[in-house]
Every structure is written in C-alpha cells, then in structure tokens.
Curated annotation (Swiss-Prot):
Homodimer. Component of the ER-mitochondria encounter structure (ERMES) or MDM complex, composed of MMM1, MDM10, MDM12 and MDM34. A MMM1 homodimer associates with one molecule of MDM12 on each side in a pairwise head-to-tail manner, and the SMP-LTD domains of MMM1 and MDM12 generate a continuous hydrophobic tunnel for phospholipid trafficking. The keyword Metal-binding does not apply. GO terms for cellular component: endoplasmic reticulum membrane; ERMES complex. This is Maintenance of mitochondrial morphology protein 1. It comes from Coprinopsis cinerea (strain Okayama-7 / 130 / ATCC MYA-4618 / FGSC 9003) (Inky cap fungus). Component of the ERMES/MDM complex, which serves as a molecular tether to connect the endoplasmic reticulum (ER) and mitochondria. Components of this complex are involved in the control of mitochondrial shape and protein biogenesis, and function in nonvesicular lipid trafficking between the ER and mitochondria. The MDM12-MMM1 subcomplex functions in the major beta-barrel assembly pathway that is responsible for biogenesis of all outer membrane beta-barrel proteins, and acts in a late step after the SAM complex. The gene is MMM1.
C-alpha cells in the first residue's frame, strides 16, 4: 500500500487522496476568508447593524395598550397599573442618568454595555459592543386578580393572591460581538455576529404570597408561572465578508436562553421594611430550601 501511495506513477489512490486534500483546503479557505474574521478589531469589519423601526406611533400604541383594561372586574387594577407605570418610568430615568434625549440614550447604552461585558463568557465571546438601546415606554398590565385560599394541609399558610400580567412594549437591544475559535491557538479566528433583539410579548400569571405572622424574616414573595409566554423578535447577521442573515437556530438559542434565565429567577422575595434585614431573609430562604430538599429526598 505504501508503494502505491508514494509511487511516481499516477494511481487512483493518489488521485483520491489529493482530491480530498484539495476539498479540505478549499473549504478551510472559504470559512477563513468569507465567514471568519482574524482581525484584531472585529467591530470595524461590519458596517451594518440590523435595527427595528422605532417610530413614535409604536410607542404611543404601546402606551395605549397598557391603559386598556383586559376584563371588567368589580375591583379594578387600573390604580396599580398606573403605579407600575410610574415605577417603570423612574427606573428608566435612573438608567439614563436622569438625562433626556441622545445624552440619556448614550448613558444607558454605556451602562448596559459595561454590564454585558462583565457577565459575558470571555473564553467564547469577544467584547460586546452595544450599538443602540430602546428602554420602552410602557409597563406590565395586571388584570384578573383573584384570591387563592390557604392550603388545607397547611392551616398556617396564608392565602395567596394571583393575577395575570401582560407586557407589550418597544424594548429592543442592538449589539455585535464575535464568537472565538480557540483552536489550534487562542483566538485563532472570530465569527462576527450582529444581533437586534426586541420584545414582542410577555404574558404570565403571578402569585403574591404574604409572610406568615410568626415568620423569623418576613418577606413578600412574587412568583411567575413556569408556563409563561415569551415572544422575542430577532434579526441577525453572521459572518465577515459573506453574511448569513436571520439564522433560525440562533433565534431559537436566544429565546431558549432568555426563557432559562427567567425560569431560574422566577421567584423574587421582598424584605418588609423594619422587620428584617436582607441578610436575615437570605438565611431564612436558604433554610427553607434545605428543608424542602430534605422533604423531597425523604419522599
């Protein structure tokens, strides 16, 4: 076999091997020079960043949708929705550094960019560049409030309040980064990625669980349903010179990761002022989790 491969006479085996090597080399050149980027400044190679049209009419539509009542109840939640709107406006203003116009937009962009690079997996993603941010104009709308009676198996448990929530706004984020290929050497090549992510709709039921009177560290617990609805709209570009637009698998991956993060943080506990410290509340929560885990193991 060795004599056949290294023979000076052209053979079928030599032609087959050379043909396969040629295909591999050609494929490597196509990937490296069309899709991958080996420059040190990846943000300079992509001049177009997909964005959504952010017209004032759309913001007005989002604001109008928040003010409409979903159902006719005896007790309206309009007062609480108005309160949520004001709270959301305060958070937006603080994120913008209490600045208006383009200056406030730039402040919010810089803060979000710093946070994104702080939590990014440095071994896989290059620096993240935030190009634009839309913080929205509305707030979640709550409706259909109802009371859930105490658990008959646990007479000490307090009644729970449950209501439905829907959030439709103009939240969007436009960014670019690069996926790093660390073989055969570190940062051997980069795959530039440009993304624009926009929220279409979030819908879920929310439970509010008050603390028991004898609780060591009284907290108010908010829990979203694990069956929440999350609709995101994404536009994407992948590649350096030759670009792939709106890859479906990338959209599915982003939506899955956002759902996973929300599902993992589906419970929020608010310490009641003057009754306990945050540290005491954390210790109480940890103790409850350990007891719950122990009961599950025994079962």
């Amino acid at each position: 076999m060795t004599n056949i491969i290294f023979s000076l006479q052209p053979t079928f085996t030599q032609g087959l091997i050379l043909g396969q090597l040629s295909v591999l080399v050609l494929l490597g050149l196509i990937l490296k020079y069309l899709f991958l980027d080996s420059t040190k400044n990846p943000f300079e190679t992509t001049s177009y960043h997909p964005q959504f049209d952010r017209k004032p009419a759309r913001k007005q539509q989002a604001q109008d949708s928040q003010s409409q009542s979903e159902i006719d109840d005896v007790e309206s939640l309009d007062w609480f929705n108005l309160l949520l709107q004001q709270v959301a406006n305060v958070y937006r203003s603080k994120l913008r550094g209490d600045l208006a116009g383009a200056e406030g937009d730039e402040t919010a962009r810089q803060r979000i960019e710093a946070f994104a690079n702080k939590i990014r997996p440095a071994g896989f993603l290059d620096l993240i560049k935030i190009h634009s941010v839309d913080l929205g104009a509305g707030a979640p709308t709550l409706f259909n409030a109802r009371i859930r009676e105490s658990d008959p198996n646990d007479p000490d448990s307090p009644p729970e309040i449950e209501f439905d929530a829907v959030y439709e706004d103009t939240l969007s984020l436009s960014l670019s980064t690069s996926y790093l290929f660390n073989y055969p050497t570190a940062s051997f090549a980069r795959l530039p990625i440009s993304l624009t992510i926009s929220l279409s709709q979030f819908k879920s039921s929310i439970r509010v669980i008050p603390p028991t009177p004898d609780s060591v560290a009284p907290v108010l617990t908010f829990t979203i349903s694990p069956d929440f609805v999350l609709d995101l709209t994404t536009t994407s570009l992948m590649g350096s010179r030759a670009k792939l637009a709106n890859v479906p698998k990338l959209h599915e991956l982003i939506q899955h990761q956002v759902r996973r993060v929300l599902g993992g943080r589906a419970t929020w506990k608010v310490v009641l002022p003057g009754l306990a410290s945050v540290a005491e509340a954390k210790q109480q929560v940890l103790k409850q989790e350990q007891e719950e885990s122990k009961r599950q193991e025994e079962a």
